[in-house]
Amino acid sequence: MPSDANEMQARLLQLFEHSTLSTKAKFGLRVIRDPKLAGIGILGRGKIFSCFHEDHLEEASRLAEVLVGAETFDEFIDLCHQCRDFVNEALFVYSLSVAILHRPDCHGISLPPIQEIFPDKFVPVETIYKAFKEATRHADKTDDIIVDMEATGTIMDPEYNLAYYREDIGINAHHWHWHVVYPSAWDSVKMHMRKDRKGELFFYMHQQMCARYDCERLSNGLARMIPFHNFHEPLEGYNPHLSSTQNGLPYAFRPEPMTLCDMHDVSVQDLERWRERILDAINLGEVTDPNGDEYALDETFGIDVLGAIIESSRDSKNRESYGSLHNWGHVLMANIVDPDGKYQTNPGVMDDTATSLRDPIFYRWHRFIDDMFQEFKRKLKPYTKDQLSFTGVEIKNVKVHAHEENVITTTFVEDLLEISNAFNFGRTGAVKVRYQHLDHEPFVYDIEVENHSARLRHGTCRIFLAPVHDELQNQLTPEELRRLMIELDRFRVELKPGVNHNHRHSRDSSVTISKQPKFDELLKGKGTNNANEYCSCGWPDHLLVPKGNDRGMPFHLCVMITDYLYDLVGDYGYDTPCVDAVSYCGAKDSLYPDRRAMGFPFDRPIPEGHASNLHQPNVSFSQIKIQHH
């Protein structure tokens, strides 16, 4: 990292500050724009930018390519200054973020939290309005102001019981950041960088979101979600209570019951046709490109090929035939209220990666998408005992050390979000929103493993969690459990001959990240190192485990140790920088550091009679409880 890392960080942060306000006074006005910016600025300022929308994404990708292609850091900054005030506000932030993450001279630079750049995507409009009222009322302009987050619903709606999860700032920021790290329009040729197993990561990260959501539903006494399956059925209602500061209009409220309608760019029939073509390809075991060449959907690369097609990304083998099912589905649902733009309303939250997780239909839609991936997985043979075993390694005992052994406690805690970096309140004091989020007590896994061989061995420890019972308190079958297994951690262990005690703290999870540096902390130099830029993509640590219930909800804890020498990809090691959230986000500029399928061993179906294959010496199933206070 160059010695002036803090200065570079500060120059970039200026571009994000007050992103919806003009910066001509700050950066100056260029009369003549750089020719590289020709054709950029089509999406007007004030419009809602969506990286699910084909045209929006195309423009954002062109801008990102220009910014990444700048030869020097100064040229990069100059291009940013030129386009900052004529490019759509959210599109600019998205493209700038993609560029920062992928420019070699920006390695070590941290992105500011998206929730501080666009708090209007995370904070109810009633709360923001209250903050402005308080800022006006306080005579002392140097005082900090704190307002409480307003509720977005009532208990009359059963889904409101899950608002704490769907509207959690951390997971919505994670979703936005994941799609910045893995843009669907990423062009490997132009960017000179291939995103390893990007299609499979798209499948796995969203599959885990669905599994986690169902675990939360069961924690709250609700039934598991019903997957979306019929393009003509009415959708449940949802009111996000968000309003865009880019144009002052609210994100569209979806009343009940409404059904999907055709838009100018895409029709409901298009989505149905793409679904059937993708399912046909899965059943045939191959996809066809525009030239008629066939690509087998095999057990090694098939899921990656399928992920690129379903999303769809630039890596899709045939976008003309298989379309863009996932992306256009988001757009159609977001525009259900005003599909032809007759009333000039904003789309709903499904249009935006920073807001879509708030809507219950997001999870039903992604369970539908995941069901298509599972159709492919059902074509693969179940794992054999040989594929699941690690000869000579035996897990003797697993404990979870917390305040009470094998009981993890969750609770709601308070946190603050500063919003004065986005809005001009006319004061020097900070303006913050106080809100609550779910959190868990710290805990430590104690895994006793015996290495029966006479030599040192290395293993990959994989830890998963799934509820014991369904919504009717029936025990879940192995196949049902498989779809609900959430990954808690994956790490390397060293196994000396004899008995080994391996301890792993929950904060070190390969799934999660701890808190990102805040905007003001970044200005002071915190976070400028090589271990940050991809790491901020991970799942929030405070939602590592589900909520549980007040009685202590029982969960299966599965611990599996596999052969690290087989799992290892190339010369990659877990000591490489920036792998704290490798499970969902991969590793920076590297191959995905695990040869196994993502979600292994629960990625493939477990037919009746095959569950015993998992009962190996190197696999442990135990029960723990998660208790909510």
Curated annotation (Swiss-Prot):
Residues making up the signal peptide according to the UniProt record: none
UniProt: Cu cation 1 binding residues: 175, 179, 206
A Gene Ontology molecular function term of the record: oxygen carrier activity
The keyword Cell division belongs to this UniProt entry's keyword annotation: no
Chain positions recorded as Cu cation 2 binding sites: 326, 330, 366
GO CC field: extracellular region
Tissue and organ expression note: Hemolymph.
Annotated SUPFAM superfamilies: Di-copper centre-containing domain, E set domains, Hemocyanin, N-terminal domain
Positions of glycan attachment: 451, 618
S-S pairs: 537-585
Compartments, record wording: Secreted, Extracellular space
UniProt record similarity statement: Belongs to the tyrosinase family. Hemocyanin subfamily.
Self-association and partners: Tarantula hemocyanin is a 24-chain polymer with seven different chains identified.
Protein name (record): Hemocyanin C chain
Organism phylogeny: Eukaryota, Metazoa, Ecdysozoa, Arthropoda, Chelicerata
